[in-house]
């Protein structure tokens, strides 16, 4: 009977041949808009053996390491990065970015042609008009194009944005939506079929956060000021759609229900005036009941805050999904969120948090109170950790993403 066993040398050659035949997938986020998400997705894809090239720029807010076993191609905004060394002027850097972005796209297209890449995955769009034409050129070159829709449309849309994004949705070969809500919105506004959109959730940030330490000094300072009080927090960029003012209006109501409560608000003010927010905070509660940190918060400090807070409030007026929800779950923090967009898909009512109506300070206070009734908090904390590891698991998300890659080229 013939012996079909391969020798060690033949096995090595077979493995090398298989690797040489493996597709290279190009993933693009020109501005690193979702740097934490990108790192975790690419890390998970690389761990399952996928060959990934990440086209991006240097992260603008500190250092984020490159995902292991991922080729990073920094082909975007070299001049703007260089200008950042000599000037802090936002208008100057924005002007340079506008000038060089078309050149960056030309370099990217040349790279795709030289490397014979067949699948291109956009995680974010910078210019709906320019990126639409890049997508068309990529497809003419034989590429299949995938786009991840974190939101169906921009949070603060400009005139014509919906039409521009619909053109992109109609043109790409496949769409990855992070929630069912986003999928439904794209289908309703753009006439896209359900088969063209896969729903893959937003995973937790543990793969990235595990590479950083905790700012224990900061955590100690917060805990010293808060004492043994329950810390109710808002984390993340401050923009109109996030409804922070509703949470601030709930301070007094929460104190009435939970006298030993303490409030923490941290994140950069992207829209509005920092001083106006500080004045509103001062009017809404006593200084000794509040900790604020209005800046871009590095990972070490985020981990410090997550280590001390008890409940995360997301009083959003509109939203499609939230990475902060999963980030909180991973550390056992329940989440109170409004029933807008896809947020309700991320919360198990009464188990990992509570869903409330938007614009309702009373509802926030009632939900916070329910978190601490009897032994409810302990159970919710355990459920939150379970959701992070099961429902929002990156290994599973990476497998589903790779399946989409294979599907578009089959």
Question: Which stretches of residues belong to each language-model region?
Answer:
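Acidic anion/phosphate-binding donor-loop and adjacent secondary structure
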Residues: 158, 184-188, 195-198, 203-222, ...
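A short, well-ordered alpha-helix in the C-terminal region of glycosyltransferases
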Residues: 376-391, 400-403
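Short N-terminal targeting/anchoring amphipathic segment
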Residues: 27-28, 90-100, 108-129, 314
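Conserved donor-binding/catalytic core segment of Leloir-type glycosyltransferases
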Residues: 226-242, 248-251, 263-266
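Nucleotide-activated donor-binding/catalytic signature segment of Leloir-type glycosyltransferases, i.e.
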Residues: 276-303
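Conserved acidic donor-binding segment of nucleotide-sugar-dependent glycosyltransferases
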Residues: 349-350, 354-361, 370-375
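Short hydrophobic beta-strand element within catalytic cores of glycosyltransferases
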Residues: 328, 334-337, 347
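Acidic donor-binding loop of glycosyltransferase active sites
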Residues: 304-320, 333
């Amino acid at each position: 009977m013939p012996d079909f066993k391969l020798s060690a040398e033949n096995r090595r050659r077979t493995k090398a041949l298989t690797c040489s035949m493996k597709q290279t997938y190009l993933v693009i986020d020109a501005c690193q808009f979702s740097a934490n998400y990108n790192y975790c997705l690419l890390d998970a894809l690389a761990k399952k053996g996928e060959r990934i090239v990440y086209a991006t720029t240097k992260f603008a807010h500190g250092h984020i390491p490159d995902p292991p076993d991922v080729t990073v191609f920094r082909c975007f905004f070299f001049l703007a990065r260089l200008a950042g060394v000599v000037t802090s002027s936002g208008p100057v850097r924005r002007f340079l970015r506008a000038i060089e972005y078309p050149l960056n796209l030309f370099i990217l297209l040349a790279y795709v042609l030289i490397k014979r890449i067949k699948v291109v995955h956009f995680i974010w769009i910078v210019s709906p008009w320019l990126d639409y034409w890049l997508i068309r050129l990529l497809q003419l070159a034989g590429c299949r194009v995938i786009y991840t829709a974190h939101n169906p449309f921009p949070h603060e849309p400009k005139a014509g944005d919906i039409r521009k994004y619909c053109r992109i949705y109609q043109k790409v070969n496949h769409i990855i939506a992070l929630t069912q809500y986003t999928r439904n919105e794209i289908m309703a506004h753009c006439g896209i079929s359900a088969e063209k959109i896969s729903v893959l959730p937003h995973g937790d940030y543990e793969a990235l956060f595990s590479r950083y330490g905790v700012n224990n000094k900061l955590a100690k300072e917060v805990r010293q000021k808060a004492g043994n009080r329950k810390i109710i927090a808002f984390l993340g960029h401050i923009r109109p759609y996030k409804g922070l003012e509703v949470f601030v209006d709930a301070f007094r109501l929460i104190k009435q229900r939970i006298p030993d409560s303490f409030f923490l608000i941290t994140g950069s003010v992207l829209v509005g005036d920092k001083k106006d927010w500080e004045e509103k905070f001062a009017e809404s509660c006593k200084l000794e009941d509040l900790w604020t940190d209005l800046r871009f918060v590095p990972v070490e400090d985020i981990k410090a805050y997550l280590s001390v807070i008890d409940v995360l409030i997301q009083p959003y007026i509109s939203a499609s999904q939230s990475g902060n929800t999963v980030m909180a779950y991973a550390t056992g923090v329940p989440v109170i969120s409004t029933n807008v967009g896809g947020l309700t898909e991320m919360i198990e009512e009464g188990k990992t948090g509570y869903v409330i109506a938007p614009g309702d300070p009373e509802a926030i206070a009632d939900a916070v109170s329910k978190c601490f009734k009897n032994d409810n908090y302990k159970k919710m904390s355990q459920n939150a950790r379970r959701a992070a590891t099961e429902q929002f698991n990156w290994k599973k998300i990476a497998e589903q993403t790779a399946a989409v890659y294979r599907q578009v080229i089959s």
